[in-house]
């Protein structure tokens, strides 16, 4: 079917081969294959390796995700995707399982349920149904059994298209009103594709696996209410969440991780450890409690210190700014639905959803020379963004949060060195917290500002730095900001879950819109380039991630209470106060449990509070001037001179010990 192209000239072919039309396929590893025109992705995978073909779920053809059944008609770059080697590979697998679940539910409940949408998501899939009566979780087992039956049937999955009117008629005959609505809203000329497996057909763009039997281990996880299209004014639907894997052992590992994640839920631990609360009077607006404020302030102090050492200055911009500013920045046109607004003296104002426009005004407040650049201006800025009620989630999804923004204004020739500097800073910060991370490059979205030349230059600069730093990265097509491409950092927590936190965005648009200038060596005005970047992202969200990553047991330097003093009896309280003073003199955060309770009870309480160190103080310790040290991590360490204990804790704090 194909030959390796190891020479520039085409190889000699037989008469039969010369009648065929061949084309060149460039694979991910850079190797070039010569194949027959019109070959399917699946057949290409088989020619490469039977094992690859067995595990393949879809492919990227010239950057676009395609079915295995897709026929390649021209010279192309092709990457065969599997469940294990890419997110797109997982999504095809999970999207197919979503259809299997929908088919099972339709088989069981028939016309009493109507199909809406059922996409793959970050971890698994969901499908929303319009149901006459809510389906109980007691029925999950029955639905899973039907799913397994469909998988065992190994139904071929076929893709076909229909003209608009035929597609509408087809779905009307099936009574699928939501699908009719979706078809009617598709742009003229848009392909209307369907996927069929046995007695089930769904409107879908794909991609999907070749048959239902390719799915192996499945589980329905939960169900909840969800408004049609996320609009609270629409009908409430029932959403079913599920997960699937190629191996039963993978599913078992995932379910075990979910059980552990429940124990680490930041909403649960936030309440137990008295870190934060969400009041019904302020949905999406978190309240930080005293211990939570200690944690937050430690993080912000750490942020300020490390940025000062890396050449940043700190600014603070107002929360409410005139509507005209948001028109100038482009937010009013591209982001207004997420903004809160108000009127002052009859004039419209916007409550800032982002810090950047304020940063533009700070730069513009004085004239700059090329000698001043780069200027690195950081801001811990409180922003507000409207989120729908059903999407709010503890500290992970809120309506107000503090973003650790920085805006770097630089010369064009400084772009690459500044991006590299940011990446090194991000790496340093994440390593302190013990996070591994992956990198993703997000390219131009449909709703963007600027010229093709500007976007190509910006994307090229980001790619060059990633290449020069030997940084592996995935491309996320079309997910850049409206004003420029971006690099996203996804940290991995102790449960293996990924969280998108850090971002670097290259922006040629804002300096243009705000007429930012500097005086060059030639004495003329020039336009600076601007970089947006965050490391934590949202302080609130990052705290939520930390709570779950550490299961509330923060390392000593982060812990709201670092040491708990436990006097055994009233006679030891005075000594406890003396020890407290010595610890506080060097900045150690300490509390005394002076209650008239048994020492075992006090120890258990301190352990539940996840305090790193407990110091038991009795007659022996008082007479010897020592402390009885118990570590959250190592248990009973024994007696230790106060100075020695202080030195141990201070070293842990100063070195950000994990």
Please state what every model-predicted region is.
Residues 18-116, 120-658:
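NTP/phosphate- and nucleic-acid-binding module
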């Amino acid at each position: 079917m194909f030959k390796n192209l190891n020479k520039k000239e085409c190889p000699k072919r037989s008469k039969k081969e010369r009648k065929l039309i061949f084309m060149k396929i460039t694979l991910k590893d850079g190797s070039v294959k010569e194949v027959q025109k019109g070959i399917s992705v699946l057949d290409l995978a088989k020619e490469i390796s039977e094992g690859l073909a067995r595990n393949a779920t879809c492919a990227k053809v010239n950057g676009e995700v395609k079915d295995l059944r897709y026929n390649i008609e021209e010279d192309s770059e092709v990457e065969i995707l599997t469940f294990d080697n890419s997110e797109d590979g997982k999504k095809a697998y999970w999207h197919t399982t979503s259809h299997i679940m929908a088919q099972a539910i339709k088989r069981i409940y028939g016309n009493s349920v109507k199909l809406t949408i059922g996409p793959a998501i970050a971890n698994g899939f969901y499908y929303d149904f319009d149901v006459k009566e809510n389906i109980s979780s007691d029925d999950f087992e029955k639905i899973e059994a039907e799913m397994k039956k469909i998988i065992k049937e190994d139904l071929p999955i076929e893709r076909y298209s229909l003209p608009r009117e035929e597609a509408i008629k087809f779905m009307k005959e099936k009574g699928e009103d939501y699908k009719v609505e979706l078809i009617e809203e598709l742009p003229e000329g848009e392909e209307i594709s369907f996927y069929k497996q046995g007695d089930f057909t769904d409107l879908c763009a794909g991609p999907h696996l070749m048959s239902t039997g390719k799915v192996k281990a499945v589980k329905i996880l939960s169900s909840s209410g969800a408004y049609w299209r996320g609009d609270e004014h629409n009908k409430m639907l029932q959403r079913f969440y599920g997960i699937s894997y190629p191996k039963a052992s993978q599913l078992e590992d995932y379910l075990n991780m979910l059980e552990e994640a429940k124990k680490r839920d930041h909403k649960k631990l936030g309440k137990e450890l008295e870190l934060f609360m969400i009041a019904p009077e302020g949905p999406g607006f978190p309240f930080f409690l005293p211990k939570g404020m200690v944690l937050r302030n430690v993080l912000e102090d750490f942020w300020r210190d490390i940025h000062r050492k890396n050449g940043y200055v700190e600014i603070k911009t107002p929360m409410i700014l005139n509507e005209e500013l948001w028109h100038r920045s482009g937010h009013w046109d591209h982001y207004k639905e997420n903004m809160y607004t108000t009127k002052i003296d009859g004039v419209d104002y916007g409550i800032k959803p982002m810090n950047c426009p304020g940063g533009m005004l700070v730069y513009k407040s004085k004239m700059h020379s090329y000698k001043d650049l780069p200027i690195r201006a950081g801001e811990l800025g409180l922003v507000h963004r409207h989120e729908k009620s059903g999407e709010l989630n503890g500290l992970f999804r809120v309506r107000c949060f503090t973003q650790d923004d920085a805006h770097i204004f630089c010369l064009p020739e400084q772009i690459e060195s500044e991006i590299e500097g940011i990446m090194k800073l991000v790496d340093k910060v994440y390593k302190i917290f013990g996070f591994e991370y992956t990198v993703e490059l997000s390219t131009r979205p449909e709703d963007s500002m600027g010229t093709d030349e500007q976007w190509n230059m910006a994307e090229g600069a980001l790619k060059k730095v990633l290449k020069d730093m030997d940084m592996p990265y995935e491309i996320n097509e079309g997910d850049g900001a409206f004003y420029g491409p971006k690099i996203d950092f996804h940290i991995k927590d102790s449960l293996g879950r990924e969280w998108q936190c850090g971002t670097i965005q290259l922006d040629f648009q804002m300096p243009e819109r705000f007429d930012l200038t500097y005086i060059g060596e030639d004495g003329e005005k020039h336009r600076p380039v601007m970089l947006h970047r965050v490391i934590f992202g949202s302080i609130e969200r990052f705290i939520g991630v930390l709570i779950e990553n550490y299961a509330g047991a923060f390392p000593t330097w982060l812990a709201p209470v670092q040491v708990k003093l436990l006097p055994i009896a009233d006679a030891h309280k005075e000594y406890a106060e003396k020890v407290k003073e010595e610890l506080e003199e060097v900045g150690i955060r300490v509390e005394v449990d002076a209650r008239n309770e048994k020492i075992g009870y006090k120890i258990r309480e301190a352990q539940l509070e996840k305090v790193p160190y407990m110091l038991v103080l009795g007659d022996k310790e008082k007479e010897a001037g020592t402390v009885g040290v118990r570590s959250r991590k190592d248990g009973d360490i024994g007696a230790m001179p106060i100075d020695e204990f202080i030195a141990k804790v201070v070293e842990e704090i100063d070195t950000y010990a994990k």
